[in-house]
Amino acid sequence: MHGHRVPGGPGPSDPERSAANTPGAAPLACADSDPGALEPGLPVSRGSGTALGGPLDPQFVGPSDASLGAPPSSRVLPCGPSPQHHRALRFSYHLEGSQPRPGLHQGNRILVKSLSLDPGQSLEPHPEGPQRLRSDPGPPTEIPGPRPSPLKRAPGPKPQVPPKPSYLQMPRVLPPPEPIPPPPSRPLPADPRVAKGLVPRAEASTSSAAVSSLIEKFEREPVIVASDRPAPGPCPVPPEPAMLPQPPPQPTGSQLPEGEASRCLFLLAPGPRDGEKVPNRDSGIDSISSPSNSEETCFVSDDGPPIHSLCPGPPALASMPVALADPHRPGSQEVDSDLEEEEEEEEEEKEREIPVPPMERQESVELTVQQKVFHIANELLQTEKAYVSRLHLLDQVFCARLLEEARNRSSFPADVVHGIFSNICSIYCFHQQFLLPELEKRMEEWDRYPRIGDILQKLAPFLKMYGEYVKNFDRAVELVNTWTERSTQFKVIIHEVQKEEACGNLTLQHHMLEPVQRIPRYELLLKDYLLKLPHGSPDSKDAQKSLELIATAAEHSNAAIRKMERMHKLLKVYELLGGEEDIVSPTKELIKEGHILKLSAKNGTTQDRYLILFNDRLLYCVPRLRLLGQKFSVRARIDVDGMELKESSNLNMPRTFLVSGKQRSLELQARTEEEKKDWVQAINSTLLKHEQTLETFKLLNSTNRDDEDTPPNSPNVDLGKRAPTPIREKEVTMCMRCQEPFNSITKRRHHCKACGHVVCGKCSEFRARLIYDNNRSNRVCTDCYVALHGAPGSSPACSQHTPQRRRSILEKQASVAAENSVICSFLHYMEKGGKGWHKAWFVVPENEPLVLYIYGAPQDVKAQRSLPLIGFEVGPPEAGERPDRRHVFKITQSHLSWYFSPETEELQRRWMAVLGRAGRGDTFCPGPTLSEDKEMEETPVAASGATAEPPEASQTRDKT
């Protein structure tokens, strides 16, 4: 691989200097302009000879061993004209001798470093052979005979080099050293750049180094090439490092080690001319001639005096100021900037240390309080001016232009404009003619009357007019959006006004919002004004009164907003119901609405329903299967007057509650506990408000009742006047009147609409008009018909219900027995020798604690059988019996055995304790009432009428 030069490469002196500055490299051989002259006396490694592949390099050659004795002074750099325009410099490294040559020693190879430099247009090409480093020994000898042909290289432009620079041909006069400014008041920190700029010296080695190590050295060393001033005569080659005289110590205090001058790059700058400013070394600003960080390309000046010199001159260099040209210097700017910041901080500290006279401090505090009050009053005035300009824009620009268009061309109705701007004209007149002039006059007379409370107190009541505007705001914004899409002319006028400078690039809706925000702004400013007023100010009383009036106006606006929101909610509900109910009324308020589950009165299944609670009524709605329009249909309307709320605690039906009203009773179930809590709280608060309203107007329930129509022996005066709570059909196994067991074919179940009991068809043959159902005729049982209308004279069914009939000992209603019981719950039971388990409702009454009653359902009026408990022993089943249910225990007496299986282990423990004490004949003492939640599968539901059950019917007493 042959060494080649890039077109426009530099003269031979440039690579020579680069090689001289490389650690461990020997100086380059530099010949005169004569191409055939070899420089004697240069040290080389073993062997001598000429370069292969062409004639000897006219400027850089590998000298023979015989030339080592020549004195160093005989080495002269070539001279020639110097170009002044240089652009960029690139290095390339090539290996020669890559092909085997016969008869030559193949152990050593030549590393060629070619240097290219862009010359000016006036330079002529100068062919030149490959350059060889002085540290490379070169070929041993030249063998006579035919030479091997050189390697072919890629076609390209012919390598050219410029002639030698003039400063290398004649000696140059070094400029005097530049003056150094005096040192700062305090010592400077150590310059971190000195340590990094110095490269440790390495002795020249006669042994050949590896090619890779040489390449790494050249790549690490930045070479800076710059034009210099032309100087006549040749430039002598610098002597060996050991022969250089030691430079005197520099004023900055940094000492260069011995022999390091030839290995460092120096930045030489001419001294200051007349009238020029001496450069400041502490400025921290790098020179424009600082070397580039790139290792292959360095930019130099196009014209003017040279800035850099690569030739570390002879002893004259020691007397010049030097600077290390390390491109990776640590932040010198940061060091200098830190010094400047510290000086500024010292000056600020000195200023703070200046004491302030105490009288001046006291006066400044007093002025600050007065200024704060004045600034708040002035802020009120300035914001009022800006606000009046916005009102002028709304009333005199937007509204006026739209009204003109509506009246002249009828592009849109004028009522639309009035609906949008409402009473903005009155608001504008109030602020523009009254409030703003008063504030301006007062601020002009602030020195004599420093107060604004009296003005606001006088005019604050008129701020209530904002309530109408605020209430209409949502509708106004909706009208603007609607007619902007519907009417082109409406849209054009709005956009034209919005483009004006007075509009401030804001939309009409933004300006319409400002009156809504103005009253809260008055309130905030006045509160701040009161806080800043000094104690005992004469304006405190008026300002406090003004704040109360403004707060009243704000509350008036808030009330208008709430009223408007309520009306919107009513309209939405009205649309949900398809206009079926007349609910849009100023006195009606929507409290709560939402989905909920309703438990069926027949079998207890859940059904999805929708409840809407108002302040005077509860609407019970069912969903409609329609995609558009009406979504719900009203099934029942329950008045709040006479409504009762009962919370249920059934374990199998959690989150349930009972709403009982005059028109209907509903057993409802929420999906979550939080939902149940919200509904119960909303209904209770509605009932409480309704009672307070009745007390306020002194409306008594007794005045609206017709007690004369009710028989005196009626067990319940509300029979027929309010809807009963129906009992579920599966909670009853027999007719609650005749006690006949039900049958799905011959004995079907029916509900009495007056009391809610489950009766058979024979016991519900009568019909009566009920007040709660708008006096419509409904099926009622015999007892309710007698209570409402008296006993019929000739009724066949009446003879079957004679009151003189003797009652059985088992005719004890289960719900009444459970109300006053020791323990009761559902149990699975089996007698000894039985074929399977049966489920029944077991009750131990409080008045008969030694008897166990067995019912078919919790609402049966007659027990199926009873079992005396004295003498029974309670215990777990025997090992050989192995029942197929969990939590099994048994009671035994002689040859009689009963097996019981409760649902939970806790319930098993309680039953065993109660039955064990009853079997021993122990008497029970009254104990605390325990909830039936853990053992009851279904809660007995109270029935209104003759057998109405109190709310605590779902609780039992465990006297263990």
Swiss-Prot record:
Coiled coil: none annotated. Zn(2+) 1 binds at C735, C738, C760, C763. Residues 372-560 form the DH domain. It is found in: Cytoplasm; Cell projection, Lamellipodium; Cell projection, Ruffle; Cytoplasm, Cytoskeleton. Zn(2+) 2 binds at C752, C755, C781, C784. GO terms for molecular function: guanyl-nucleotide exchange factor activity; small GTPase binding; zinc ion binding. PROSITE patterns: DH_2, PH_DOMAIN, ZF_FYVE. Residues 137-149, 156-165, 173-190, 231-251 have a biased composition (Pro residues). Interacts with DBNL/ABP1 and CTTN. Binds CDC42. May interact with CCPG1. Activates CDC42, a member of the Ras-like family of Rho- and Rac proteins, by exchanging bound GDP for free GTP. Plays a role in regulating the actin cytoskeleton and cell shape. This is FYVE, RhoGEF and PH domain-containing protein 1. The lineage of its organism: Eukaryota, Metazoa, Chordata, Craniata, Vertebrata. The gene is Fgd1.
